[in-house]
Design a protein with these regions (language model features):
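PEST-like low-complexity, intrinsically disordered acidic/proline/serine-rich tracts
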Residues: 8-258
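Bacterial N-terminal signal peptides
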Residues: 1-5
């Protein structure tokens, strides 16, 4: 059992515990994978307007664990860290436990924003829409209304946004507990609260996201991490058919998570 993750130093020790464990079943998938580079030379430049996010963006790197830094798990309470360890062992045995995406349900938040697939952003009066290639997930960010007084929990929750200067601040609540924080299986409850801060940097060629996650049920403390999405006007999000879940079947024939 891992100790509770209460400080940055403790979180680093947890990461070392997972990455350097004598238990081969706890070996982690490599923490970072490069996804998108800059757009090819000659591509259409991004808008000079810092509030114009319209277009296709592609995450620059992908991480299995969405902790406060690369390869560091979220600050989970001990009982939920035990669940994460169990899921990692099952995956490494070749018998991964099911999650929402196993049967083509949405990935949920904040996990969806880590997907290594491109996103098309569309801006209209009162709303910003994220069209995700992965499983054709759609996020609607409302700019002209607050959260409803009562929310039925859903996979992607309810998102409202506002501009603070050149930064789009998105507040998401009303998430159900049927998904995970990240691809390794870090648990969250229906009390999870996600705040995203988006701003264009590097001459508008990069979209910076600072994500802050809180959950009083499963986490010992709030935590934040940063991601960069590349401006990719040369990319057109493709068809994604989740139901064809055997198209990448491994050689050992294991295609079903239990």
């Amino acid at each position: 059992m891992l100790a509770v993750c209460c400080t940055a130093q403790a979180q680093q020790r947890q990461a070392q515990r997972l990455n350097n464990s004598d238990d081969p079943g706890l070996t982690l998938t490599p923490a970072i994978a490069r996804v998108s580079a800059d757009a090819p030379p000659g591509s259409r430049p991004p808008s000079a307007d810092p509030r114009d996010l319209e277009g296709v963006w592609w995450i620059s790197r992908y991480e299995y664990l969405l902790g406060p830094s690369a390869g560091v798990p979220p600050p989970l309470k001990p009982e939920y860290m035990a669940i994460l360890e169990r899921r990692i062992r099952a995956k490494n045995r070749g018998t991964p436990e099911a999650d929402a995406s196993t049967d083509c349900r949405p990935h949920g938040m904040p996990r969806l924003m880590e997907s290594p697939y491109p996103i098309r952003i569309i801006q209209t009066p009162g709303q910003i829409t994220f069209l995700h290639e992965v499983a054709h997930n759609i996020r609607r960010i409302y700019l002209d209304q607050p959260h409803p007084a009562k929310l039925k929990p859903t996979y992607l929750g309810h998102s409202v946004g506002r501009w603070e200067g050149d930064t789009l601040v998105v507040d998401t609540t009303g998430l159900n507990d049927k998904t995970f924080i990240d691809d390794e299986g870090s648990t969250h409850s229906e009390q999870i609260h996600v705040v995203e801060r988006y701003r264009k940097v590097n001459g508008g060629r990069d979209l910076e996201l600072v994500m802050t996650v809180t959950d009083p049920v499963t986490l010992t403390q709030p935590y934040s991490y940063t991601r960069i999405y590349k401006w990719r006007p040369d990319i057109k999000p493709a068809e994604y058919v989740c139901e064809e879940n055997n198209r990448n079947a491994p050689e050992n024939g294991v295609t079903v998570a239990k």
